[in-house]
């Protein structure tokens, strides 16, 4: 079944708050909890244990995503309004193009509990910069010091960046950023996870999918 991810892993469940491309909490995210299928959780724990030996940690941005949340994102993309804060996430084109270009889908693997969005944290680095909703950050493709802080290694773009620079094999990132991406992809692949080529942060466990769920995410007891 699908269960809360009770693992010693950093979590910043972005759709439960305002620090995401809509600027508000998404429908169905009643708590900032990572919920995954049991097999996914077991394998994430193994990835985390391997990374710990390198003084690294995973950080979860999204796990199970209720079907109602996907519908909310679809409606948002079609409402015809776009703020500067929203545009940070898709600087090269309008949010109306997100579907056509494959950045938002009407059905998400996240709704099966078998997909996760995550990044790496360097445990030896200063990760103290916090997101300030009142600050006017540069877009998600800008240098790390100028874009919204995420308390993680520099992957070359921010999370949920709808841009070719966020494609995992993008040639426009630096060698150091490419190494971080490779470290994450390799660690996840060793436990059977497959990366989505347009998003360095998105991984799924092949064969663990199935039916989409729509129960809301609530605080773990």
Indicate residue ranges for each PLM-predicted region.
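Long, well-ordered alpha-helical scaffolding segments within enzyme catalytic domains
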Residues: 36-54, 128-195
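Extracellular structured ligand-interaction cores
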Residues: 10, 55-57, 113-117, 150-152, ...
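Acidic, His- and aromatic-enriched active-site or binding-groove loops in soluble protein domains
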Residues: 77-115, 119, 123-125, 145, ...
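Solvent-exposed coil/turn segments that connect beta secondary-structure elements
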Residues: 18, 121-125, 160
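Active-site acidic/histidine clusters and adjacent loop/turn architecture
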Residues: 30-68, 76-77
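Short, small-residue-biased leader/transition segments that mark boundaries at the very start
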Residues: 1-7
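Low-complexity, Gly/Ser/Thr/Pro-rich intrinsically disordered linker/tail segments
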Residues: 186-221
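Acidic/histidine-rich, surface-exposed loop or edge segments in extracytoplasmic proteins
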Residues: 10-33, 163-168
């Amino acid at each position: 079944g699908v269960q809360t991810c009770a693992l010693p892993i950093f979590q910043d469940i972005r759709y439960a708050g305002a620090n995401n491309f809509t600027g508000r909490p998404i429908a169905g995210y009643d708590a900032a909890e990572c919920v995954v299928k049991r097999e996914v959780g077991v394998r994430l724990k193994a990835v985390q244990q391997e990374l710990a030996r390198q003084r690294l940690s995973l950080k979860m941005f999204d796990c199970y995503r209720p079907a109602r949340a996907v519908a909310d994102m679809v409606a948002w993309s079609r409402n015809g309004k776009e703020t500067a804060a929203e545009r940070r996430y898709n600087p090269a084109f309008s949010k109306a193009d997100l579907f056509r270009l494959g950045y938002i889908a009407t059905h998400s693997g996240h709704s099966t509990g078998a997909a996760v969005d995550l990044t790496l944290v360097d445990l030896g680095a200063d990760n103290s910069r916090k997101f300030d909703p009142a600050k006017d950050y540069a877009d998600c493709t800008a240098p790390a010091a100028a874009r919204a802080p995420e308390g993680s290694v520099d992957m070359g773009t921010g999370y949920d960046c709808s841009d070719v620079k966020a494609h995992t094999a993008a040639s426009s990132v630096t060698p150091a950023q490419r190494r971080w991406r490779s470290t994450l992809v390799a660690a996840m692949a060793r436990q059977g996870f497959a990366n989505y080529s347009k998003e360095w942060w998105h991984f799924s466990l092949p064969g663990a999918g199935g039916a989409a769920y729509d129960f809301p995410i609530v605080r773990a007891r």
